[in-house]
Each structure stands twice: as C-alpha cells, then as structure tokens.
Amino acid sequence: YPVDGIHFDDYFYPNLDDSKAETWFDYPEYQASGTSLSVAAWRRNNVNELVRGVYSAVKSIRPQALFGISPEGYLQNLRKDTRQFTDVDAWMTQSGYVDYLMPQIYWGFEAKQNGQAAGYAFANCLNEWVTLKKKGNVKLYVGLALYKTGTDAVDGNEVPEWQRYHDIMK
C-alpha cells in the first residue's frame, strides 16, 4: 500500500569518543577514497549522501511522501567531529535532504549538570533548534519521550521534575 512517509528514528552514527581516526572502523575506506577531506568531513559527507539518496528515492517513488529523521536533540553533540557526523545544519537549511527533522529532546526543563542548568535542558535545546529552523524551510517537530514520564531520574535534581510537577505535560 502507498505509505505516507519514511522516518529514520534514532539515527545515530557509531559514537567515536576516541579522537584517533586511524582506530575507527571505516578508516581503511577513508584512506582508499583518496579524498582531501578530514575523516570527520568525509564521514559527514557520506551520511549526507545517504540521506540525500534516501530522500531522492522516496520522492521518485511517491512524491507526496515525506522523509524525516529523529537525530539526537542536543545540537552541540551533533556538531562535534567525533560524535555522530550528522550535518543537521545542511539538512535543515538546504533542499533535497529531508522534509522534517524531529530532534529527540528528551531532557527536562530543569535538567542540571554539575549543579547548574544544563545546556541540554529542554528549553535550551528547543531554542537552538528553533533558531536553526528559521534558516530553512524544513519542518521541525519535537520528539518527546513519554515513556520517561514519571520514571526518569537523570535530570540532575534530587527529585525529578516529572514527580515534582503534575502539569508538566499540559
């Protein structure tokens, strides 16, 4: 049957906290490519080509179908060279990649890190995504983790906000 769209959920490239590129699983392919790009730029380009290819395939089969991705919600992590090689800036601002992005903003409004408001707190993340959205025509939807409601205790507070506020999802 005709589908309404294709959605990549939990798009994550293998997280490579090791900054030594020669230890990465795809380093031999990188060397064989003969590119002048850095390993990080090469990987980001490979991901961009994959995303652009899927978008093109979806549109060639059913032009009205949508294609979207749910990347991590914290833009600072997405933009690091040893993390996920996700070029959401290009995806959001250039045509031919996605119809929408749905960042997984799964942190609370009062998330803390080292006793301070965390950069990844919900409002901070949302504001960064909205700012990026203003630079392009791609739709922005926010992914929420309802399965964490009432159970998530990793917001850095003694009592999670899900338990402190009864109207948080209103």
Where are these regions (language model features)?
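Polysaccharide-binding and catalytic clefts of secreted carbohydrate-active enzymes
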Residues: 1-97, 104-107
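Extracytoplasmic/secreted cell-surface and envelope-processing proteins
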Residues: 15-18, 77-79, 109-120, 150-156
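Context-gated lysine
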Residues: 20, 59, 80, 112, ...
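Active-site clefts of carbohydrate-active enzymes
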Residues: 34, 64-78, 126-166
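Residue-level preference for long, well-ordered alpha-helices that form the structural scaffold
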Residues: 36-47, 80, 114-118, 122, ...
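Alpha-helical scaffolding within the catalytic cores
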Residues: 52, 78-92, 117-133, 164-168
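Loop/turn-rich, solvent-exposed surfaces of beta-rich toroidal or solenoidal domains
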Residues: 98-111, 117, 121, 125, ...
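Extended low-complexity acidic/polar segments
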Residues: 99, 169-170
